[in-house]
Structure formats: structure tokens, C-alpha cells
């Protein structure tokens, strides 16, 4: 009886060992199958990615080079282009060459004849007369007075008349100045005396002056 029990126990132990050995084999098979499926999936993913990348590259090339595709040249007329021009075209008009007048000898001769017949007017220079400068400090002497041919009584009155000082100026109050400025002032007629020119001698200037009976205060003093 004991031998049978031991035999049964041994058989059970062997069966368990066999079961344990079969489980890792299945796991290995399952793992190998899963690895194959993973590799297949990776290959599909890589293929899809490569296709997408190539498509994007093609789109970029189409955007960068829109006219990269070959286009057929279309001519407006089917016949060949002639290399020679048609003979119906009129010849080009040539402009006549105009010779300037100064190159022709006949025109030069006519111009010389005209110049000989009508000579150019030459401007005559004005003669420059010597001008004696006249200064205000110049004074009359007795010989100059005698050469003027003035009457003797007028000359004696000029010679014997003493020099009189100028009258003192009168100061007016401010009210009188205002009254004079407000009143209408009538113009006083004065005799026009010709202004002595520089080129005019003294004798000619004194001939224009009229004899004055009163005291004479001329611009030129008489030296005795």
C-alpha cells in the first residue's frame, strides 16, 4: 500500500513539472509573435512617415518652382518664320545733307562785299579836358576882384565893411513852440542861387550873383 501511495505522489510531481515546463514555451511563442507584430507595425509606421515626408517635399518644390514643369511652345502661326524681309516694304527716306553757309565760298564772298559797302560805325572817343579841382578853402585876392570888372563903389563897400558877429539865438518857451507848430506856416519865397559847379571858374560864378547893398557874408572870404 505504501508503495502505491509513493508511486502516485511521484506521478503527480512529474505531471506538475511537465506543466511548468510547457507554460514557458507558450510564453516564448507568444513573445516571439508579439515581437513580429511590433516589427511589422514599426515598418508600416516608417513607410507612412517616408510617404508623408516625400509628399511634403514635392509640395515645397512645386511652390518654389511653379514653372519647373516643361511647357510646350505654342506659336501664333503654324508656318515657319521667314528669315528674309518682304520686298513690298518701301526704302527708307534719306534726309538731304544741309551744308552750313559758312562752308560755301560764294556766301563768304557776299558777306565780305556787304561789310565793305556798309562799314561798322566806330565810336569816337570824347576829348578829356583838364579839370581844375575847386576847394572850399580857396579865397579871392585883390587881383581876382579887379579882374571881375565889378563897380568901384561895390568893391569899396566890401573892403571897408567890418566883420559883424552873428546875432544870438532867441530861446522860446515850449508853449510858443507848440503854438507855432500848430499854426499854418506860409512858405517864404527865396531867390534861387545857382550852385557852383566844380568845373565852373570863380569869375563865372560871381557874374551870376546880383550886387547886394547890405552886409555880404559869402562862402569865400576876401583877403586884402
From Swiss-Prot:
Changing residue 190 to E: In variants A1 and G. It is found in: Secreted. Mammary gland specific. Secreted in milk. The keyword Ribonucleoprotein does not apply. GO terms for molecular function: antioxidant activity; cysteine-type endopeptidase inhibitor activity; metal ion binding; potassium channel inhibitor activity; protein homodimerization activity. Keywords: Antioxidant, Hypotensive agent, Metalloenzyme inhibitor, Metalloprotease inhibitor, Milk protein, Phosphoprotein, Protease inhibitor, Secreted, Signal. Its main location: secreted. Residues 1-15 form the signal peptide. The modification Phosphoserine is found at residues 30, 32-34, 50. Pfam families: Casein. Changing residue 121 to Q: In variant A3. InterPro entries: Casein, Casein_beta, Casein_CS. GO terms for biological process: negative regulation of canonical NF-kappaB signal transduction; negative regulation of inflammatory response; negative regulation of lactation; negative regulation of tumor necrosis factor-mediated signaling pathway; regulation of blood pressure; response to 11-deoxycorticosterone; response to dehydroepiandrosterone; response to estradiol. One of its GO terms (cellular component) is extracellular space. Belongs to the beta-casein family. Important role in determination of the surface properties of the casein micelles. Casoparan acts as a macrophage activator, increasing the phagocytic activity of macrophages and peroxide release from macrophages. It also acts as a bradykinin-potentiating peptide. This is Beta-casein. It comes from Bos taurus (Bovine).
Amino acid at each position: 500500500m505504501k508503495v502505491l501511495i509513493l508511486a502516485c505522489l511521484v506521478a503527480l510531481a512529474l505531471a506538475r513539472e511537465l506543466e511548468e515546463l510547457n507554460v514557458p514555451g507558450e510564453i516564448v511563442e507568444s513573445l516571439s509573435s508579439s515581437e513580429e507584430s511590433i516589427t511589422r507595425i514599426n515598418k508600416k509606421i516608417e513607410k507612412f512617415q517616408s510617404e508623408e515626408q516625400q509628399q511634403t517635399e514635392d509640395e515645397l518644390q512645386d511652390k518654389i518652382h511653379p514653372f519647373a514643369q516643361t511647357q510646350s511652345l505654342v506659336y501664333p502661326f503654324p508656318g515657319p518664320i521667314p528669315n528674309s524681309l518682304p520686298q513690298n516694304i518701301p526704302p527708307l527716306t534719306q534726309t538731304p545733307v544741309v551744308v552750313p553757309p559758312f562752308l560755301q565760298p560764294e556766301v563768304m564772298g557776299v558777306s565780305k562785299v556787304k561789310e565793305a559797302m556798309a562799314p561798322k560805325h566806330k565810336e569816337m572817343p570824347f576829348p578829356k579836358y583838364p579839370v581844375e579841382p575847386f576847394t572850399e578853402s580857396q579865397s579871392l585876392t585883390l587881383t581876382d576882384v579887379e579882374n571881375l570888372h565889378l563897380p568901384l563903389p561895390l568893391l569899396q563897400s566890401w573892403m571897408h565893411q567890418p566883420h559883424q558877429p552873428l546875432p544870438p539865438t532867441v530861446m522860446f518857451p515850449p508853449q510858443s513852440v507848440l503854438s507855432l507848430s500848430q499854426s499854418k506856416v506860409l512858405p517864404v519865397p527865396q531867390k534861387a542861387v545857382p550852385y557852383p559847379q566844380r568845373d565852373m571858374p570863380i569869375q563865372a560864378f560871381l557874374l551870376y550873383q546880383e550886387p547886394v547893398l547890405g552886409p555880404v557874408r559869402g562862402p569865400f572870404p576876401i583877403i586884402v
